């Protein structure tokens, strides 16, 4: 299944480098790639000389349930915008395919080690690019793509908070083994470097939410280390990584970062606007409690619930849980709760 693993790596890399695959052309390539990769797996499975057992990961079931709910919204016209729900459903189907293929392609410890190394190296490269672009920024993504809708970019993302979210997802791949003492002595330096650069990039992005989430991650890891009684010399390794990351940020210009951290708040959604969006989204849920307004339809249904108009389009609530309830109802909320519970227990 090596070609399938390579295909998954390529899709992950493309999704990140294409600004999160949020534009129609990028979504189309991602969806087509997932479909072709599924076809490749099916052909190899059918003509395989040895018998392969198909694995259904536990996370697949709540995702499938949510997909079926969205299909029902579309089929029975329980959606405010059939076009939008269909688009989001196509993306969800692509994610289901990738989750299924990952379960088939990554089975052995060697497979997962390869995945971990890919994530660490890719995160290092993306973070390094983000730092370089930050230091030489000319107002364009990749130095040539204009920002159509404004924003505060970092790395390949048009929104620095999205970059911080990406780093939050991949940083544990290098940081956790260091803190838990799962890295061989001869690899400590390279794994440490693979953690320092993404960590430095996260701090440089000046994403308040990202830095707060990082603090929460570190607190959780500290608790795990205490419970497992693995603190001590392993804590020193983690401390060195954090210290070097802070020194890197200081060397690159801490004053610039602090001013950016405080001065760009006016370019983001204000706290009053966030509170207004949460309130409006909650009212949408109360008016459509069972099935919601349709997957991905918040932008279409939100205007009548607007209480703090500022001339800008609200396409997301900045609260995923509330938005899920508003667009998929109680049934969708139960699917999300099922997914989270499975994630923590599997």
What are these regions (language model features)?
Residues 1-121, 176-193, 219-243, 269, ...:
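Transmembrane signal-anchor hairpin modules in multi-pass inner-membrane enzymes, especially those
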Residues 12-15, 194-206:
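Membrane-interface alpha helices of multi-pass inner-membrane proteins
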Residues 21, 77-93, 149-164, 270, ...:
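Short aromatic-rich membrane-water interface segments that cap or initiate transmembrane helices
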Residues 26, 109, 128-137, 144, ...:
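A membrane-periplasm/extracellular boundary helix in multi-pass inner-membrane enzymes
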Residues 67-74, 111-146, 158, 199-205:
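Hydrophobic alpha-helical transmembrane segments
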Residues 126, 139-177, 206-209, 319-324:
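Membrane-interface segments at transmembrane-helix junctions in multi-pass inner-membrane proteins
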Residues 159, 275-314, 321-335:
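TM-adjacent membrane-interface loops and short helices in multi-pass inner/ER membrane proteins
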Residues 330-346:
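Hydrophobic transmembrane alpha-helices and their immediate junctions
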């Amino acid at each position: 299944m090596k070609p399938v693993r390579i295909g998954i790596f390529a899709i992950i890399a493309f999704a990140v480098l294409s600004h999160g695959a949020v534009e129609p052309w990028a979504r189309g390539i991602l969806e087509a790639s997932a479909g072709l990769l599924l076809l490749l797996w099916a052909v190899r499975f059918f003509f395989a000389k040895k018998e392969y057992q198909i694995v259904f990961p536990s996370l697949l079931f709540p995702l499938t349930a949510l997909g079926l709910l969205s299909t029902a919204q579309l089929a029975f016209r329980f959606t405010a915008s059939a076009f939008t729900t269909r688009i989001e459903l196509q993306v969800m189907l692509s994610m289901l395919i990738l989750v299924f293929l990952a379960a088939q392609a990554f089975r052995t410890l060697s497979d997962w080690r390869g995945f971990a190394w890919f994530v660490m190296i890719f995160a290092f490269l993306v973070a390094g690019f983000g730092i370089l672009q930050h230091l030489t920024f000319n107002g364009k993504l990749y130095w040539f793509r204009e920002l159509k809708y404004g924003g505060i970019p970092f790395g390949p993302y048009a929104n620095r908070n999205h970059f911080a979210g990406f780093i939050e997802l991949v940083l544990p791949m290098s940081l956790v083994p260091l803190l838990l003492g799962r890295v061989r002595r001869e690899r400590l330096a390279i794994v440490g470097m693979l953690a320092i650069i993404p960590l430095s990039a996260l701090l440089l992005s000046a994403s308040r939410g990202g830095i707060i989430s990082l603090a929460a991650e570190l607190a959780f890891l500290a608790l795990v280390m205490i419970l497992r009684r693995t603190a001590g010399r392993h804590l020193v390794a983690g401390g060195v990584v954090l210290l070097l990351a802070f020194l890197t940020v200081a060397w690159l210009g801490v004053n610039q970062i602090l001013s950016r951290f405080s001065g760009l708040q006016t370019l983001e959604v204000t706290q009053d606007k966030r509170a207004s969006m949460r309130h409006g989204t909650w009212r949408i849920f109360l008016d459509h409690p069972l099935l919601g307004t349709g997957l991905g339809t918040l932008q279409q249904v939100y205007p009548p619930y607007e209480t703090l108009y500022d001339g800008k389009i609200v396409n997301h609530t900045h609260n995923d849980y509330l938005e899920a309830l508003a667009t998929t109802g109680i049934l969708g909320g139960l699917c999300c709760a099922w997914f989270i519970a499975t994630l923590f227990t599997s």
